[in-house]
Structure formats: C-alpha cells, structure tokens
Amino acid sequence: MCMPCFTTDHQMARKCDDCCGGKGRGKCYGPQCLCR
C-alpha cells in the first residue's frame, strides 16, 4: 500500500500510480492508495 489518497489533491491518482510503479498500477480506494 502506498500513501493515503486525498480527495482534495487532483494529482492524487498520478501520485498513487507513481508510487505503485507506473501509470495504471495504482488505484485510490477511499482514503487508501492500493497497488495492483
């Protein structure tokens, strides 16, 4: 699991992806960034 996802941050989806290793790899699920 990566950092928490903040709905106020419009870059969050990209940050989650980056944390998980690339585009489309991360998914914000509620307050958590989950990696596929």
From Swiss-Prot:
Q: What is known of its domains?
A: The presence of a 'disulfide through disulfide knot' structurally defines this protein as a knottin.
Q: Where in the cell is it found?
A: Secreted
Q: What is the lineage of its organism?
A: Eukaryota, Metazoa, Ecdysozoa, Arthropoda, Chelicerata
The remark listed among the other comments is: Negative results: does not interact with MMP-1, MMP-3 and MMP-9. Was tested in clinical trial under the name TM-601 for treatment of malignant glioma.
* Keyword annotations of the record: Chloride channel impairing toxin, Disulfide bond, Ion channel impairing toxin, Knottin, Metalloenzyme inhibitor, Metalloprotease inhibitor, Neurotoxin, Protease inhibitor, Secreted, Toxin, Voltage-gated chloride channel impairing toxin
Expressed in which tissues: Expressed by the venom gland.
- GO molecular function annotations of the record: chloride channel regulator activity; peptidase inhibitor activity; toxin activity
Uses in industry and biotechnology = Is under several clinical trials (phase I, II and III) as BLZ-100 (Tozuleristide) by Blaze Bioscience Inc. as a fluorescent imaging agent that labels tumor tissue (CNS, oral cavity squamous cells, breast, skin) to enable more complete and precise surgical resection. BLZ-100 is composed of the chlorotoxin peptide covalently congujated to a derivative of the fluorescent dye indocyanine green.
The reply on keyword Disulfide bond is: yes
Keyword Magnesium on entry: no
The intrachain disulfides are: C2-C19, C5-C28, C16-C33, C20-C35
Q: What's its job? A: This toxin binds to the surface of glioma cells, and inhibits their proliferation without having effects on normal brain cells. In this context, this toxin has been described as a chloride channel inhibitor (probably ClC-3/CLCN3) by causing its internalization via caveolae. It has also been described to selectively interact with MMP2 (in complex with MT1-MMP (MMP14) and TIMP2), to inhibit its enzymatic activity and to decrease its presence at the cell surface.
Q: What GO cellular component entries does it have?
A: extracellular region
Name of the protein:
Chlorotoxin
Organism, by scientific name, is Leiurus quinquestriatus quinquestriatus
Protein family? Belongs to the short scorpion toxin superfamily. Chloride channel inhibitor family.
One Pfam family of this chain: Toxin_5
